[in-house]
Amino acid sequence: MSYQKPKGTNDILPGTSEKWQFVEETARLIFKDYQYQEIRTPIFEHYEVISRSVGDTTDIVSKEMYDFYDKGDRHVTLRPEGTAPIVRAFVENKLYGPEYTKPYKTYYMGPMFRYERPQAGRLRQFHQIGVEAFGSENPALDVEIMAMALDFFKQLGIQQIKLVINSLGDKETRATYRQALIDYLEPHMAELSEDSQRRLHENPLRVLDSKDKKDKVIVAEAPSILDYLNEPSKAHFEAVTDMLDLLEIPYEIDSNMVRGLDYYTHTIFEIMSEAPKMGAQSTICAGGRYNGLVEELGGPDTPGFGFGMGIERVLLTMEAEEVVIPALSELDAYVVGIGSDTNVAALQLVQSIRNFGFSADRDYMNRKPKAQFKTADKLQAKLVLTIGENELNEGIVNVKSMATREEKAFPLSAIHDSFDEVYDEMMTKMIEE
């Protein structure tokens, strides 16, 4: 019987995993520059953590959660997104305490799970990179985090992107706008999709996020939330746009953008790919401010701002823009052993080379010298060390630069005791030539 991976999942194999490593390591370097530290949470959470934070009426909670009762009859769910688990950890571990620097800056990476129809860039197990910052209402933090996301894409080599922003205001703004939206949508009730009819009185802002074509036509004429911002909300959003202008960061404002999660307040944003090959899957990063979420999960009133991005979607964007990913797995040395008597000596050589901090490999398949040299060439080894029975008896090894084809014999002891000097000598000759 043959087994296959579950629908909507992927095996990330060598050759592809290097691309993932490049994205992840680039993110770590950027986040370090901005003083964000990593946090790791369980891949499953209590159901209420997600339902209370993300919102009962969202598609995620109502349709897409992998939730179940465990053997102790506890209702748990595989995490569908990263922010709620981070907020839960922030509250549970009292990271809001005075001993911690504010804003408390953190990032995460890992798998998320949603039961949805698999398609390009949308899987049932997908992988997310995200950041969260807690403790500051300063609009400058909103701008810093958006700038950090753009910086990350720039470092990856992604160029064809745009920043789209909106404000959802505070609770007072939301309440005023909610009623205005209901008043506008109610006359169109019969024309709305089934989902939007259900949401109209539960959470009317979610109607703005509908993917239904008829809904989109109706929503296009809906009142703008920006016309309902109270003075504090208006001041916050104006400060954000002023600082984006000051930093010369281009952006567009989309007053119908609401995001698919209920916890957002004030600034929200999306970074979209404009690469022609990306098609409908154009949003590659999204986030915003959530000033009530920490309190919702049992913590003190603490503002927050963050974003999330799917690694799969980022890689699709890089592919669409034909970004060349630099080789991460360079091989410094390959040892060719000729004859069965050299088996132990070849093992000693690769271990000695690795002990000096260099990458090394050798043949374990008893292949002929020609096949071993072919492997060294395929692996793009910088140096090839050859040892046969004659060399073993003489206590030497032949070292060849694959770039210059220059070859030199060294004592075996030189490899074991000072390979770094051997490497430098051979590589220096290559540079000189």
Curated annotation (Swiss-Prot):
Keyword tags: Aminoacyl-tRNA synthetase, ATP-binding, Cytoplasm, Ligase, Nucleotide-binding, Protein biosynthesis
Subcellular location: Cytoplasm
Domain of life: Bacteria
Gene Ontology MF, one: transferase activity
Primary enzyme class: ligase
Known catalytic reactions: tRNA(His) + L-histidine + ATP = L-histidyl-tRNA(His) + AMP + diphosphate + H(+)
Enzyme Commission code: 6.1.1.21
Subunit text: Homodimer.
Family per similarity comment: Belongs to the class-II aminoacyl-tRNA synthetase family.
Name of the featured protein: Histidine--tRNA ligase
Gene expressing this chain: hisS
